Structures are given as structure tokens and as C-alpha cells.
Amino acid sequence: MERGRTKEILGLGILSSMFFAVTFILNRSMNLSGGFWVWSAVLRYVFSLPILLVMVGMRGKLKPVWASIRRSPGAWFLWSTVGFGLFYAPLTWASDFGPSWMTVSLWQLTIVAGVFLNPLFGKPVPMKSLGAVAVILLGVVLLQSQEIASNGGGREALICVGLIAIAAVTYPLGNRKMMVLCGEELDTTQRVLGMTVCSMPFWLVLGCIGGAARGLPSTAQTVQALVVAVFSAVIATLLFFQATNLARNDPRQLSLAEGTIAGEIIFTLLGGVLLLHDPLPGAVQWVGIGVIIFGMLLNCRAAR
């Protein structure tokens, strides 16, 4: 039973990582074509909202979402803003500072954050996962060392790391807080819809800032943001949250679910190089990517 659940969690996580890779590739594409990162972030959630409303509404399950929000509006708006707003805004901004494969490789810091968030929810840190955490951190250092050395201190590389570190903490934190708040009352799609609705004030403010700073987005950026909304904000997020829902009561399996996002590295590297002509990683960076993937595999093994 548990082995079958582990396989299901692993399969859902890897599938979600393939769809999440679209985010990194298209965010970089929008950046290279002159699109403002603020609109890339805002439009993803603006477009995903009506899609989710239709998905939940067709099943007649909207009322439980509104009822849950009315009972705990403060918690809903806070953790939705943390889990979606403070996750995706810095992650999108980070695409300004390097190729898509670098951004997605650094995003594996989520695995590290996920392990150390357990005590906040009354669960122990999975000791078997600590070795994987150390390996992933080593990979991150190797990945950025060449960038820093070749850019006289690597200010942009450090900014990129800082932005992704923020996203790596806020995403699992917001997700887990909302799982605790909702319990079994809402399914994954309902929870994602509720979080999208409650993060809208954040996106409205950010959109006003974007409009004042750079004007409205281009048609090309708008279309690409729509694709990101469908593939990443809806499909990938639902798959990932379903995996974490299955693992919610087992800290080892929860770390496994969150660890599968490392599959994004392979999908994004291939897409970035083939579609965007991103520069290939240097020798040390290849080693760093390999070390990060090895850390993911160690984390999966620790969860068995």
C-alpha cells in the first residue's frame, strides 16, 4: 500500500515538473523579447483564475471554497499571498539574471527549504534527508561559482540566488499552511482556486506598479503568459499539490513529493537550449547540475 502510494507521489511529481519547466522556458523567452517580468508574473495568475473557476464550477464545488474563505479570511489572504505572490514574483524576476537552466537549477533550493520547514508543522526533520540537502547545497555552490568568477564578483548571480531563495521558502510554506487550514474540506483544485482568488490583491498592486513603470504588456507576452497559466499555474500546480496531498501525513514522503521538482532541470535545460538557444553550462556548472540531480535521487531514496 505504502509502496504504491510512493510510486503515485513520484509519478505525479515528475509529471508536474515537466509542465513546470514551461514556466522557466517562457519566462526567459519573454525576458529576451523585452517583456517586463512583472507582467509575466501577474498575467499568469490573472489568466489562471477564470480557468480554475470553470473547472471547479462545472463540478458544482464553488460554495465550499467561498465558505472556507469566509471562515478564515485573514489566513487565506496571508498564506495565499505568501504561497503564490511571494513565490512567483521573485521567481519570475530571477529570469532577468540568467539562462533558464540556471534559474531552474537554483529552484531546487525548495527541497532544502521543505526539509527544514517540518518543525513549523509539528513534524520532525527527516534525518535521512539531511545528506541530500548537503549535496544539493554543494551543487548550488558549484553552479554559481563559475558565474561569480567570470563576472567579477557575480552581483547578478547573487541577486538571482537571493530571489530564488525567497521563492523556495514561500512556496512550500504557503502550500503547507493552506493544507493545514483546509484539511479534508477542499480538494486540490478547490484549494488552488481559493489561493488564486486570495492572492489577487497582491497581483493587482503589482500590476499597477508594472503599468506605471513600463506600460501594458505586448500581445506576444500576453499569449506566452496564457500558455504559462494553462501549463504551469493550472496543470502543473494541480499535479504537484495532489502529490503533496497524498504525502501530507508522512514527512519523508512529503520531502519526496517536493523533491521531484528537480526533474524540471532536465526538461528546462533541453527546452532552453533547443528553443531559446541558451548557452550550454560550463564544465563546473555541468558538475553542479549533476550534483543537484544526485541530491534529488538521494532525497527520493531517503523517502522510501
Question: What label would you give each PLM region?
Answer:
Residues 52, 128-147, 283-303:
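Hydrophobic transmembrane alpha-helices of multi-pass small-molecule transport proteins
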Residues 41, 45, 254-304:
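C-terminal-most transmembrane helix of multi-pass membrane proteins
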Residues 33-86, 113-117, 135, 169-174, ...:
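Transmembrane alpha-helices of multi-pass small-molecule transport proteins
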Residues 30, 40, 44, 93-95, ...:
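Hydrophobic/aromatic residues within transmembrane alpha-helices
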